[in-house]
Amino acid sequence: MSEEERPAALADTILRFLCHDDIDTVKELCADWFPIEYPDSWYRDITSNKKFFSLAATYNGQIVGMIVAEIKGRTKVHKEDGDILASSFSGDTQVAYILSLGVVKEFRKQGIGSLLLESLKSHISSTAQDHCKALYLHVLTTNSNAIRFYENRHFHQHHYLPYYYSIRGVLQDAYTYVLYLNGGHPPWTVMDYLQHLGSALAGFSPCTLPQRIYRQAHTLLRSLLPWSSISAKSGIEYSRTM
């Protein structure tokens, strides 16, 4: 889509990283967007600590959206999401966790959330290269708008987490959503193994395997015995009876 076709807000949006001076604004936005209360240390970290990817979308100098994420080794993933990647991936394989993604109400449905998410994915590709295999997040089961947003961008529900959040003293359920990148995948299920086995067996004709075994045994026997006139006729008959 060209600049002329974009909504005015998106065309005039400028991206920049959060800084310490943004703390008060970010606090106000998070209080409006999310029902969860974050400690002051969290705001200091996401605006100052370089381990976080904290990107703001600004319009006329005002923050109208932001995304906060952390790229980390798979061994640092919390226990409830420890099976996001199959165990075949090494311990230094990376994943990216979205801590926060929000847009001011008046600027929603104009592509700003997608712009922020795509910027994170581009950052992952340029810094972690192909070592980052998954991008994941948590979302309230009741947040249908957020769920729709992520599902429309190819995220898939990975876990149901009962009583995951405590909101104003009330325990509420969450989902884990995952987008796999660079060949990443979850552990195989029993159905995956059965499908793989079925695909492998589909490549064999009913007699292929017995014929292979016979030919190998026949070759070995000829190399061991003093005579080499063993007929292959029985092998042909064997294949016909299968």
From Swiss-Prot:
Domain of life, source organism: Eukaryota
Single GO MF descriptor: protein homodimerization activity
Classification via Pfam families: Acetyltransf_1
GO cellular component: a single term: Golgi membrane
Catalysed reaction, written as an equation: N-terminal L-methionyl-[transmembrane protein] + acetyl-CoA = N-terminal N(alpha)-acetyl-L-methionyl-[transmembrane protein] + CoA + H(+); L-lysyl-[protein] + acetyl-CoA = N(6)-acetyl-L-lysyl-[protein] + CoA + H(+)
Cytoplasmic side: 1-192, 237-242
InterPro entries named among the record's database cross-references: Acyl_CoA_acyltransferase, GNAT_dom, NAA60-like
Keywords from the UniProt entry: Acyltransferase, Chromatin regulator, Chromosome partition, Golgi apparatus, Membrane, Transferase
Annotated localization: Golgi apparatus membrane
Domain N-acetyltransferase: 13-182
Region of interest called Required for homodimerization, as start-end residue ranges on this chain: 162-173
EC number(s) on file: 2.3.1.259, 2.3.1.48
Membrane topology reported for the UniProt record: Peripheral membrane protein
CDD domains: NAT_SF
Annotated positions binding substrate: Y38, L99, Y165
Chain's role: N-alpha-acetyltransferase that specifically mediates the acetylation of N-terminal residues of the transmembrane proteins, with a strong preference for N-termini facing the cytosol. Displays N-terminal acetyltransferase activity towards a range of N-terminal sequences including those starting with Met-Lys, Met-Val, Met-Ala and Met-Met. Required for normal chromosomal segregation during anaphase. May also show histone acetyltransferase activity; such results are however unclear in vivo and would require additional experimental evidences.
Protein family according to the UniProt entry: Belongs to the acetyltransferase family. NAA60 subfamily.
Subunit description: Monomer and homodimer; monomer in presence of substrate and homodimer in its absence.
Protein name from the UniProt record: N-alpha-acetyltransferase 60
Natural source organism: Xenopus tropicalis
Organism phylogeny: Eukaryota, Metazoa, Chordata, Craniata, Vertebrata
